Amino acid sequence: MESRIGLVLILSLFTAACGARVIHVLESVPAEYQLKLAKLPRVWVAGFATGKKPEFDLNLETVRLIRTQLRTWSSAQVIQAEPLTIDTEQRLSDVAYWRRLGEEHGRPLIVTGTVKLLLAPPQVVQRGIRTIYLPLAGRTLEATVVIIDGGSGQVLSTRKLPSRMRYGVGRFSSGLSLYFQMMDQAMPDWFGAITGTTPVSSEPNHS
């Protein structure tokens, strides 16, 4: 645990010194996830299909974030490689494609899937007998995690994560800021999908 705390401090100091975005590392994860994370083999977080023209590089940010969390909370060797650009969701079930890439990367457990950041509907507030729409910036995060055997290229599991919605005000209302806030909340869902653990809670989050 001391080594994990040290890693969190190093990451924070490094990103602060470089002026880069700080990736928040979870302070704790459910015990049932920790047991499974400790047994993970080599893992390759390959890349994600993100749909058309996301407002920032959603694939890159998701790959970076998941790799950072796995390096912190698992003993697996997390492969460092350029994120794949997955142009269609059909590619996720292309056995020959993943078998070839799996061989090139030493037959790891492959983490891929889809991640979409969508505009949220206007927020509705009831004040007495009046209903008003607040023009707050909001986003909805939708993700499906696909786990692939790097030796055979076969899909081992596919799990759609609970969707999340969040609104922000001022400097916390950008798509990137809201994305990081929702991913922070969703990380136990990601760990559950990667390790094959039954979700602690499958209720969607709206805030």
Map each language-model feature to its residues.
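Structural motif
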Residues: I10-L13, L35, G102
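C-terminal/domain-edge helix-coil "capping" segments
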Residues: C18-L40, A120, L136-S207
